[in-house]
């Protein structure tokens, strides 16, 4: 089975721009690529920061763009989002009994548990007891025959970019304790960082991917401001194969340069 993961769309109301870029145009391009190349996917997941300022008009524009997909779409919260506006504009968004945008995506092969780490008034992430209890319950319902994955907006660790490390998930101990009490998820997806980062945390493999509208520049020294850029965006194509093999490709969906083969005369010495 296959699914698609995007993050950090940072929508503004239709017709507006953000940092001189057009989030709607970029997501529309991603939607077109997914329609053309990945119509066999089970679902699409967006791991938070759906909008930049949490405006209702921005959620309306996001909803219009995503209507171009003939696939189920699951939306998560990020620190730039407004929970009340999101649920009002897009009532199909799943929330738990406490009103947090938390849910589990289930297929015969997979349980993907999606957590809400957003806290109004701060860019950093937090998991309160209610949210951790949700995770504890969902992990407890996972059978040994099904792959378990986890998705959060905020990573619970430093990535080495000081301006972002200051606004990560600040209370990771509670998350660690819940995970230690269960069979661990086999993979974790994060957003928030606006860079392609992968590694191991607590022995668990994870992936962070680039955002849709803009990226964070690769600056390991600046701590007072978050340096931004318009490096190319991407989305992830996640495939689970019958033998349990997990494969993740990234799609640079805005690339429109030439395609050639290793037999191309000018490139024979390179390949």
Predicted region positions:
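Acidic, His/Gly-rich catalytic cores of divalent-metal-dependent hydrolytic chemistry
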Residues: 208-271
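Active-site environment of divalent metal-dependent phosphoester hydrolases
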Residues: 12-15, 52-57, 79-87, 120-123, ...
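His/acidic metal-ligating clusters that form di-metal
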Residues: 30-43, 125-207, 234-237, 246-247, ...
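Extended active-site neighborhood of metal-dependent phosphoesterases/phosphodiesterases
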Residues: 56-144, 174-177, 181-184, 202, ...
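N-terminal active-site segment of His-dependent metallophosphoesterases
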Residues: 1-61, 65-68
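Active-site-proximal beta-strand elements of phosphoester/diester hydrolases
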Residues: 1-13, 109-119, 149-152, 204-210, ...
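Short glycine-enriched, charge-decorated loop/helix-capping segments at active-site entrances
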Residues: 16-22, 91, 121, 161-168, ...
